[in-house]
């Protein structure tokens, strides 16, 4: 089932998500819906808060990205970054901030402890695009958006777009969470 995406300024995107205690049929269904929703929106990563669930769950599939065709889709539950190495600056975008891109400096490689779709504990080394997407999605679990990590001068360049999104002006090819936009009253 394709789920609507929460958009910039939706409160759930600023909450710290709660850990999962296990995987049941409802979580399995959510995981399948998250993959379907992510692919429908031409995304490469999606965190549960982006689809209205404040839990520490994310999915990613970077196999559509050049030089990443060999990468397998991943389910990451309750992630914890154990260590980081190096840094790189790369342009990012986000399904929750449609139409906005910006450069973000992130560690180039990470060691990650997490649980998989069967709730089995895993530790893995990730680099390149996979490491970047995991970090971007973990930020969602912590209530942080990529625009928060942009340099101040770069963020000023996108302020107009962020203001439009916050006021409900959203243009996407995928479903988004409907919200009531209350116009600001003008003084009489």
From Swiss-Prot:
Q: What class of enzyme is it?
A: hydrolase
Q: How is the cofactor bound?
A: Binds 1 Fe(2+) ion.
What reaction(s) does this enzyme catalyze?
A: N-terminal N-formyl-L-methionyl-[peptide] + H2O = N-terminal L-methionyl-[peptide] + formate
Known Gene3D superfamilies for this protein? Peptide deformylase
Q: Which InterPro entries match?
A: Peptide_deformylase, Peptide_deformylase_sf
Which CDD domains does the entry link to?
Answer: Pep_deformylase
**Family note:** Belongs to the polypeptide deformylase family.
Q: Which HAMAP family match?
A: Pep_deformylase
Name of the protein described by the UniProt record: Peptide deformylase
């Amino acid at each position: 089932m394709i789920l609507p995406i929460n958009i910039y300024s939706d409160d759930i995107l600023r909450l710290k998500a709660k850990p999962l205690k296990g995987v049941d049929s409802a979580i399995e269904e959510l995981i399948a819906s998250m993959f379907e929703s992510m692919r429908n929106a031409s995304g490469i990563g999606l965190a549960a808060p982006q689809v209205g669930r404040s839990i520490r769950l994310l999915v990613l599939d970077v196999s559509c990205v050049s030089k990443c065709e060999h990468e397998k889709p991943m389910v990451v539950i309750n992630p914890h970054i154990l260590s980081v190495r190096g840094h790189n600056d790369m342009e990012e975008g986000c399904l929750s901030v449609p139409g906005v891109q910006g450069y973000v400096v992130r560690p180039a490689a990470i060691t990650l402890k997490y649980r998989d779709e069967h709730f089995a504990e895993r530790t893995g080394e990730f680099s390149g695009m996979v490491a970047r997407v995991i970090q971007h999605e973990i930020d969602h679990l912590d209530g942080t958006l990529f625009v928060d990590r942009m340099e101040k001068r770069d963020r000023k360049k996108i302020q107009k777009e962020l203001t439009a999104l916050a006021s409900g002006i959203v243009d996407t090819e995928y479903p988004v969470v409907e919200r009531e936009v209350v116009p600001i009253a003008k003084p009489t």
